[in-house]
Amino acid sequence: FLSHSNFGSSKDASALKVRRARDLFRALAPDVECDGEMHGDSALSAKLRAATMPDSTLSGEANLLVCPNLDAANILFNVLKTVAGSGVTIGPMLLGAAAPAHVLTPSSTVRRLVNMTALAVDEAQVRRRTGK
């Protein structure tokens, strides 16, 4: 769970929102490893996180980055997509509504379109099967 605050270093409303989101996630999915609120570099570097927050429950590098708002998520997605070069990206996805929304941007490749379509079809099948 990403923030400008690092493990309680700020009492700002945004940092508190991220902490509440992390707590809610932990309550709903106690078996899923997560931690935060933390800086992006702490999320991606186990070595840095161990130095700054030795009690962190996250092992290794984060493989999912939860952002505090849509602006931050969009900026991060586009920066990582560019920095990663020709790596495969799946996303962005907007969660929290009655159903997930998959967003395709003008820079979407055919591969991303196929990946997002496959993901949406799988989610639709799961929703139909489970009634959720």
Where are the predicted features?
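Glycine-rich phosphate/nucleotide-binding loop
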Residues: 24-132
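Glycine-rich phosphate/diphosphate-binding loop of Rossmann-like nucleotide-binding domains
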Residues: 1-37, 41
